[in-house]
UniProtKB/Swiss-Prot annotation:
Lineage: Eukaryota, Sar, Alveolata, Apicomplexa, Aconoidasida
Protein's UniProt name: CX3CL1-binding protein 1
Region PEXEL motif, residue ranges: 52-56
Biotechnology: Potential vaccine candidate as CBP1-based peptides or antibodies against CBP1 prevents adhesion of infected erythrocytes to endothelial cells.
Organism of provenance: Plasmodium falciparum (isolate 3D7)
Transmembrane is among the record's keywords: yes
Top-rank taxon, per record: Eukaryota
Function text: By binding to host chemokine CX3CL1, mediates the cytoadherence of host erythrocytes infected with parasite mature forms (late trophozoite and schizont) to endothelial cells, which sequesters them away from the circulation and thus prevents their elimination by the host spleen.
Site (Cleavage) residue list: L54, S55
Subunit structure, interactors included: Monomer. May form homodimers or homotrimers. Interacts with MAHRP1. Interacts (via extracellular domain) with human chemokine CX3CL1; the interaction mediates the adhesion of infected erythrocytes with endothelial cells.
Signal peptide segment: 1-24
Transmembrane segment boundaries: 161-181, 192-212
Subcellular location(s) per record: Host cell membrane; Host cytoplasmic vesicle membrane
Biological processes annotated in GO: cell-cell adhesion
GN (gene name): CBP1
Residue numbers on the Cytoplasmic membrane side: 25-160, 213-243
Amino acid sequence: MNIYIRTIFFAPFICLLIFSSNHGLFQKKDNQNCNSHKFCLNCSGSYLKNSRWLSETSVSYSDEGEPLKYGANDNNYDSNLLKSEEQKQEISEHMKMLIKLYIDSSHDSAKEEKLFQQVKKYFKNNEYKDFMRTFIKVIKIHNDLTHLKKQMASTEKRYRIISCVAAFLSTVSLAFTVVMLSTLNLKNENVIVTIILGLLGFIISLPVISYILSPYLNSSLEKGYRIADLYSEKILRQILHFQ
């Protein structure tokens, strides 16, 4: 009889202990999932900074684009009164603001930090999850295109320098060959020297070929620029019209 009484007495404490341990485990897993979201914002490979995840509250924006929080007791805002189409339009407007903030934050650290915070908020909201997955993928593609255009610009700059140097060396070598041939007597003993100087001038003048072909190479580089710009604009235009 004493055993049954002790079992009944200690059973609630054992159940409470098991429940508290499981609750702590689930909370730890949720925190790990929250901290696992990160994406590359620019070509240098910067990531989302770790910070506290905000609670799931309804979010709206003022005219300046600043986020406004609405509590459950606020009479000016009631999410239950919004229709599905109005909610969809609101999501679309928020996403357009987010894209515009991303485009404008390339050289502004303050706007970049603001973008970090906004992205973290939307990751927590179920209504925005599908868009955020697409948004992150598009950002990565857009960054790759930007990095490609920078590489093309660097290649074009090096090519133009090499072309100018080649043209200068070609002009000097041709002038040197003409002067040397004009000062030599066309006798039998000087024929070998003349041939050697002529071959030397021809070899040095080979960069003229690259100078002649430079318009075609420039056309290829410009075509690559146009392709990169076209895809970059197409990506931004598609995501701006996300519904």
